Amino acid sequence: MDIVQNSFEAGSIHVAVTIEQGLEKIVCTIEDDGKGMDAHQQRSVLDPFYSEAGKHDRRRVGLGLPFLHQAVEAAGGSFVLESALGEGTTVRFSFKSDHLDTPPTGDLALALATLLAHPLAQDLVIKRQWESDGKRGGYTLDRSELLEVLGEFESSGNLLLLRQFVASQESEVPSEVR
């Protein structure tokens, strides 16, 4: 969630999140059209004691990318950060599904619903794909389409409907993949 929030805070209009999950690995890609980073910033963002000046009033460090990078390395996964100043950023990472140090997925439906309702989110599309025993499936959550149906994400009733809808989509994912 923190990495997607970085996209929102970087002024992104379009953010695409893809989660591909199989029996052997989990691959996640976050692409945005935010302000992007130069080469120095790309190296610096993996330092836990670096945070962009003025980005946060009360926080002086940015731990999301450094912690993610550390977790990926510990679990034998991969991490790629691509960015160009003025063009946006792509973060792609993977975890081996069966590695002891791969963190648990947790309540993915709640996490995805929270991202969709984030006050800085504009055009957010989340694609969730899975493969298990030769079968493939998935779903797409498009914030714009969900807003057309629900109207807004401020009221508790609409937030509950959003959460229930995302949970219903996630319930279709086979348990051995989750």
Role assignments for model-derived ranges:
Residues D32:
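Acidic ATP/Mg2+-coordinating residue in the GHKL
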Residues E87-T89:
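Glycine-rich GHKL/ HATPase_c ATP-binding element in histidine kinases
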Residues E20-C28:
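Short beta-strand-loop-beta element adjacent to the nucleotide/active-site pocket used for signaling
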Residues L81-L85:
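A short beta-strand-to-loop motif within the catalytic HATPase_c
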Residues F67-G77:
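Conserved glycine-/histidine-rich ATP-lid loop and adjacent helix of the Bergerat-fold HATPase_c
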